[in-house]
Design a protein with these regions (language model features):
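Conserved hydrophobic/aromatic packing and binding residues within compact polymer-binding modules
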Residues: 20, 35, 46-49, 74
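The alpha-helix within a helix-turn-helix
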Residues: 24, 36, 64
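DNA major-groove recognition helix of helix-turn-helix
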Residues: 49-50, 67, 75-78
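Short, basic-rich loop-to-helix N-cap that marks the start of a DNA-contacting helix
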Residues: 52-65
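A short, Lys/Arg-rich alpha-helix, primarily the initiator
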Residues: 1-27
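Helix-turn-helix DNA-binding elements, focusing on the entry/boundary residues of the two helices
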Residues: 20, 31-32, 57-60
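Short alpha-helical DNA-recognition segment
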Residues: 28-47
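Short, charged recognition helix plus adjacent turn
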Residues: 1-11, 75-88
Length: 88
């Protein structure tokens, strides 16, 4: 993976992490420990999500269900550019 691709991936993960944090607070979970408990996750596992760790889609779906947010709503303000790869 090119350095520029890695930078883009990190920026996208950071945007997703920020969105998680915003939605958590908007839904009344004052800190990450409370939502981690509700999700039956360890505090450290959830904390990694809010700090930009890569994670599985099924984890995001579980979080969205708890927060009563659709995936479409979750991603609405997150810009993920299309691939720049050329077709052969």
């Amino acid at each position: 993976m090119k350095d520029s691709d890695q930078k883009t991936n990190n920026e996208e993960l950071a945007a997703i992490a920020q969105r998680l944090k915003e939605l958590r607070k908007a839904k009344g979970y004052s800190n990450y420990e409370h939502i981690a408990f509700a999700l039956e996750m360890s505090r450290s596992a959830y904390w990694r999500l809010e700090t930009g760790a890569n994670f599985e889609l099924k984890t995001l779906i579980k979080i969205c269900r708890l927060l009563e947010v659709s995936l479409e709503e979750f991603f609405k303000d997150i810009k993920i550019p299309a691939s720049k790869n050329e077709k052969p």
